[in-house]
Amino acid sequence: MKTHVKKGDEVEIIAGRNHKGKRGTVLAVNASKGTVIVEGARTLKKAVRPTEQNPEGGIQEINGPIHISNVKKVG
């Protein structure tokens, strides 16, 4: 799939009930799935089990993917 944005671009989210109008920087592009990850736009909470690297575990916030058709390049 051809993409109009790349990693590091400034984008605005143009569709979506909770995220419309937000701006951020593209952290990653997945061309095969047609999604992008925008910094601070769609934060998800993920439960993490305790491991040796993270002995406390708990809830971690991560950035979720947004379909590439829902973002517009700014500037």
From Swiss-Prot:
Primary gene name: rplX
Function: One of two assembly initiator proteins, it binds directly to the 5'-end of the 23S rRNA, where it nucleates assembly of the 50S subunit.
Name recorded for this polypeptide: Large ribosomal subunit protein uL24
Family membership noted in the UniProt record: Belongs to the universal ribosomal protein uL24 family.
GO molecular function terms noted in the UniProt entry: rRNA binding; structural constituent of ribosome
NCBIfam families xref list: rplX_bact (TIGR01079)
Entry keywords, A to Z: Ribonucleoprotein, Ribosomal protein, RNA-binding, rRNA-binding
Subunit structure: Part of the 50S ribosomal subunit.
Keyword Lyase (UniProt): no
Keyword RNA-binding attached: yes
Gene3D superfamilies: 2.30.30.30
A Pfam cross-reference name: ribosomal_L24
UniProt GO BP: translation
An example Gene Ontology CC term for this record: ribosome
InterPro entries for this protein: KOW, Rib_uL2_dom2, Ribosomal_uL24, Ribosomal_uL24_KOW, Translation_prot_SH3-like_sf
